[in-house]
Amino acid sequence: MSDLRRRDWFLRAGVLLGATSAWAQSGAAATLPAAQSLPDELSQALKNKHPLIVMVSLDGCGFCHRARQSHLSPMQRAGTPIVQVDMRNPQPVLDFAGKLTTHDQLTRLWKVSITPTLLFFGPGGKEVAERMEGAYQPDFYGPYLEDRIAQGRKAL
């Protein structure tokens, strides 16, 4: 293999690896921690005088991905207490009463039928702000989210 062809091959491989890495990082940036113990997660949120935000998501939901990527993941990385519960997911989780259940059972208990849905929980696992259902108004999603967080904080 000539030096020119070898250099061209390495250049193309580098571009491909760089693009793959950027794609993987953008996907990683759009994740939220899965709820595992709602009592513990709520306790931590309340210590910081903040409602616990629970995003109900569904695998493959484009609106969910957009809400995570544009708003929720950056907020969570900045310290806002946000966890995710997935519809149709049998992953175990402790509910607010400390009982073992699944993500899917929680979504049914909370009567969530639209994704994404954001719920804002305060003391005792009670909802302290109006739910945000859907993400079909992207220009207003951020202001609506900030309003719900303020509503939740006021109720604490």
Placement of each model-derived feature along the sequence:
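Short active-site neighborhood of thiol/selenol oxidoreductases, capturing the structured segment around
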Residues: 48-59
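Thiol-based oxidoreductase modules, predominantly thioredoxin-like and allied folds used
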Residues: 79-100
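Structural micro-motif
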Residues: 104, 108-119
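N-terminal "domain-start" segment that seeds a small globular fold
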Residues: 25-42
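Non-globular targeting/processing and membrane-anchoring segments
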Residues: 10-14, 25-26, 30, 111, ...
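Typically the conserved alpha-helix immediately C-terminal to a functionally engaged Cys/Sec
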Residues: 65-77
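N-terminal secretory signal peptides and thylakoid transit peptides that target proteins
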Residues: 1-17
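Non-catalytic, surface beta->alpha helical segment in thiol-disulfide oxidoreductase systems
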Residues: 120-153
